[in-house]
């Protein structure tokens, strides 16, 4: 039966390479492709679409994690908690616009004191008119 299928034990088997590693990504391209196909977003899904989507998701995740890590470090913490993610997202103009309608669980609120509630400035900034 020579010539049919693979022969046992001859030669080295080629190691499978994932589409994520080919694209240099950490996010799973194959899983995203499966979700796109199962979700019935379109009748057909191109080969580059899941790669592009995985790259975009990875970039957004890295951006949020970097800003949240900075917020955690500013608060002298070594662990990122939802509060740090909330502070990171709301302090960044573009991320705040993108995630404007998103509620982050246990994120708290942004610290804000209305200007009318702040104490009045009573400094000698203007010279008085009583010297005349």
Swiss-Prot record:
SMART domains assigned: H2A (SM00414)
Primary site of residence: nucleus
Superkingdom of the organism of origin: Eukaryota
Region (Disordered): 1-22
Pfam families: Histone, Histone_H2A_C
GO molecular function, one term: protein heterodimerization activity
Swiss-Prot/TrEMBL keywords: Chromosome, DNA-binding, Nucleosome core, Nucleus
Disulfide bonds listed in the record: none
Transmembrane regions listed in the UniProt entry: none
Family matches, as InterPro entries: Histone-fold, Histone_H2A, Histone_H2A/H2B/H3, Histone_H2A_C, Histone_H2A_CS
Tissue expression as described in the entry: Low level of expression; mainly in roots. Found in the root cap cells and in non dividing tissues of the plant, including the root elongation and maturation zones and the leaf veins.
Subcellular location: Nucleus; Chromosome
Annotated Gene Ontology cellular component terms: nucleolus; nucleosome; nucleus; plant-type cell wall
Modification note: Not ubiquitinated.
Record carries keyword Zinc: no
Assembly, per entry: The nucleosome is a histone octamer containing two molecules each of H2A, H2B, H3 and H4 assembled in one H3-H4 heterotetramer and two H2A-H2B heterodimers. The octamer wraps approximately 147 bp of DNA.
Role: Core component of nucleosome. Nucleosomes wrap and compact DNA into chromatin, limiting DNA accessibility to the cellular machineries which require DNA as a template. Histones thereby play a central role in transcription regulation, DNA repair, DNA replication and chromosomal stability. DNA accessibility is regulated via a complex set of post-translational modifications of histones, also called histone code, and nucleosome remodeling.
Family: Belongs to the histone H2A family.
Protein name as annotated: Probable histone H2A.1
């Amino acid at each position: 039966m020579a010539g049919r299928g693979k022969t046992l034990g001859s030669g080295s088997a080629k190691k499978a390479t994932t589409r994520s590693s080919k694209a240099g990504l950490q996010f799973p391209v194959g899983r995203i492709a499966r979700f796109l196909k199962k979700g019935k977003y379109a009748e057909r899904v191109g080969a580059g679409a899941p790669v592009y989507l995985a790259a975009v998701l990875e970039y957004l995740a890295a951006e949020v994690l970097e800003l949240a890590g900075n917020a955690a470090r500013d608060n002298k913490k070594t662990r990122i908690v939802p509060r740090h993610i909330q502070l990171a997202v709301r302090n960044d103009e573009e991320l705040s616009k993108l995630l404007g309608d998103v509620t982050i669980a246990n994120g708290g609120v942004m610290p804000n004191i209305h200007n009318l509630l702040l104490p009045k400035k009573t400094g000698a900034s203007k010279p008085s008119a009583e010297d005349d």
